[in-house]
Amino acid sequence: MRSAQVYRWQIPMDAGVVLRDRRLKTRDGLYVCLRDGEREGWGEISPLPGFSQETWEEAQTALLTWVNDWLQGNEGLPEMPSVAFGASCALAELTGVLPEAADYRAAPLCTGDPDDLVLRLADMPGEKIAKVKVGLYEAVRDGMVVNLLLEAIPDLHLRLDANRAWTPLKAQQFAKYVNPDYRARIAFLEEPCKTRDDSRAFARETGIAIAWDESLREADFTFEAEEGVRAVVIKPTLTGSLDKVREQVAAAHALGLTAVISSSIESSLGLTQLARIAAWLTPGTLPGLDTLHLMQAQQVRPWPGSALPCLKRDELERLL
């Protein structure tokens, strides 16, 4: 016997979270909980403002329609990426497809004073991989900060993310301030320039490896082995169903590319599922999931070791 609940939620964010020039004051989303007999599965639907095609309200309408269809015995998935991902996660838990084993390691997101970062990163146990957002300030400053971190910590590798912020000139200004001897320890730089051709040229000219992120969601993108391209960054909330995520990971691996499962600032429930997906589909590759600290609370399922308060399901607004 099938049954389902849908919950709506809103989590206050830390004051400094800015996405595409918009301050993100709250993270808004939905949960679906599916039951079939004794089995249960959860999924999170949380479109990311400025990045998702769909709004929270559109996702809610699509989710409620899909849940009612599922209760009638239909097995298809919705089209909207965030709804398809959340619904497929709930089904994967319900059927036991999504393994319980998780990779709760996270490449720490580096913000704040560079001198403080050096101290924090130097004390990191094990493999030292960290992420730095670039393109928010002057390119020269970004280059100097990256160079400082790589110089101060000889075993540090950095993942950089520019979100297509730079013109070719700005990208070259950044590279000019990174010692060529350190560039091999830039694991990859996500989408440095506004166009793929400019990003490819940057990689060829500087020897700094790049990764595709936004490109994966463009209609004309195809997976290819290209000079200077080392990785793809897959954000399941923006991608679609678990099957589509699996297809992208498999396509990347077939070309020898690194596939990184990455957060779209999901709640703790969604992040713990992404940690399981990463352990399942990209074992041995550190996922990019260090976003929980941007929020003021957890929900339903806590992230191991987090001190943030965790709301229970009966504290959420139920829609169905």
UniProtKB/Swiss-Prot annotation:
Q: Which reaction does it catalyse?
A: (1R,6R)-6-hydroxy-2-succinyl-cyclohexa-2,4-diene-1-carboxylate = 2-succinylbenzoate + H2O
Which EC main class describes this enzyme?
lyase
Note whether Magnesium occurs among the keywords: yes
Alphabetized UniProt keyword annotations = Lyase, Magnesium, Menaquinone biosynthesis, Metal-binding
Gene Ontology terms describing biological process: menaquinone biosynthetic process
Q: Between which residues do disulfide bridges form?
A: none
Q: What is its EC number?
A: 4.2.1.113
**Cofactor(s) needed by this chain:** a divalent metal cation
InterPro entries assigned to the protein according to its UniProt record, in alphabetical order:
Enolase-like_C_sf, Enolase-like_N, Enolase_C-like, Mandelate_racemase_C, OSB_synthase_MenC1, OSBS_N
Record pathway: Quinol/quinone metabolism; 1,4-dihydroxy-2-naphthoate biosynthesis; 1,4-dihydroxy-2-naphthoate from chorismate: step 4/7; Quinol/quinone metabolism; menaquinone biosynthesis
Q: Where do the annotations place Mg(2+) binding? A: 161, 190, 213
Job of this protein: Converts 2-succinyl-6-hydroxy-2,4-cyclohexadiene-1-carboxylate (SHCHC) to 2-succinylbenzoate (OSB).
HAMAP family reported for this sequence: MenC_1
Protein name, UniProt field: o-succinylbenzoate synthase
**Organism encoding this protein:** Salmonella agona (strain SL483)
Gene for this protein? menC
